[in-house]
């Protein structure tokens, strides 16, 4: 029974995070489709086209973040605190390095990549604009994803749910709705809202992880 409780305690927040991501995608499509500044179909198509290309960035970051759950959990269970700290530094540094590479790649080469997927000049323009803004968000996305998975590996899963809710719904979707629907700004203001949410979430996740690691350090002192 205790094992089942632990599985649900760690698994339910992760599952709810995926639900929030799907809900956020729905909200963004609705907001972009409600914009008066561009064609709704062009706005949604540009967002979805950019999202498909973005998977090139997300695949390695998700792989690193997911592997950290196993490695951190294994070392935490074995009370190898020295290895916990080293693997955290390694995972974060590699995630940031990869994200910076993709940021540079998308910012400078998106105008050459996107025409492969569409012939529409308006969709190409909006997608390039998307990457010119979101390119700056990728390092912060990497930090937020990695930190939340590290905390999950340490047996604390609810930060992942809270951080996803904070980033996707409370900040990103709210700012997009305010800028595009209320103020009537161009749709790229919605992506500025996403950039802001990614920066704030990365800062919160780092502070949260730092607090948890302080508790881990106290456990290490007791064990030693």
Describe the function of each predicted region:
Residues 22-50, 56, 74, 112-121, ...:
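Helix-terminus/linker motif at the lipid-water interface of multi-pass membrane proteins
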Residues 1-27, 52-60, 135, 161-165:
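Hydrophobic faces of transmembrane alpha-helices in multi-pass small-molecule transporters and flippases
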Residues 47-110, 141-163:
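Small-residue-rich hydrophobic transmembrane alpha-helices
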Residues 24, 28, 68, 109-110, ...:
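Hydrophobic/aromatic residues in alpha-helical transmembrane segments
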Residues 1-12, 72-137, 179-224:
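Short alpha-helical transmembrane segments in multi-pass integral membrane proteins
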Residues 14-26, 62, 94-103, 107, ...:
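Hydrophobic alpha-helical transmembrane segments in multi-pass membrane proteins
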Residues 52-55, 121-147, 166:
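Alpha-helical transmembrane segments of multi-pass membrane proteins
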Residues 29-32, 62, 106, 149, ...:
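Structural signal for membrane-spanning alpha-helices in multi-pass inner-membrane proteins
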């Amino acid at each position: 029974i205790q094992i089942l409780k632990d599985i649900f305690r760690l698994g339910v927040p992760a599952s709810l995070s995926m639900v929030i991501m799907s809900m956020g995608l729905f909200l963004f499509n609705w907001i972009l489709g409600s914009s008066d500044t561009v064609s709704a179909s062009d706005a949604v198509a540009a967002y979805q086209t950019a999202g498909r290309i973005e998977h090139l960035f997300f695949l390695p970051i998700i792989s690193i973040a997911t592997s950290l759950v196993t490695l951190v959990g294994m070392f935490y269970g074995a009370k190898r605190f020295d290895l916990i700290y080293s693997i955290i530094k390694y995972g974060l540094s590699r995630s940031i390095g990869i994200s910076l590479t993709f940021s540079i790649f998308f910012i400078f080469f998106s105008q050459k990549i996107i025409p492969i997927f569409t012939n529409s000049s308006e969709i190409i323009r909006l997608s390039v604009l998307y990457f010119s803004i979101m390119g700056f968000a990728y390092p912060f996305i990497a930090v937020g994803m990695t930190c939340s998975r590290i905390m999950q590996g340490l047996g604390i899963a609810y930060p992942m749910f809270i951080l996803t809710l904070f980033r996707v719904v409370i900040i990103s979707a709210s700012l997009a709705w305010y800028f595009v629907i209320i103020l009537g700004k161009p749709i790229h203001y919605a992506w500025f809202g996403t950039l802001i949410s990614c920066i704030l979430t990365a800062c919160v996740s780092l502070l949260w992880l730092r607090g948890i690691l302080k508790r881990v350090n106290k456990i290490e002192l007791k064990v030693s």
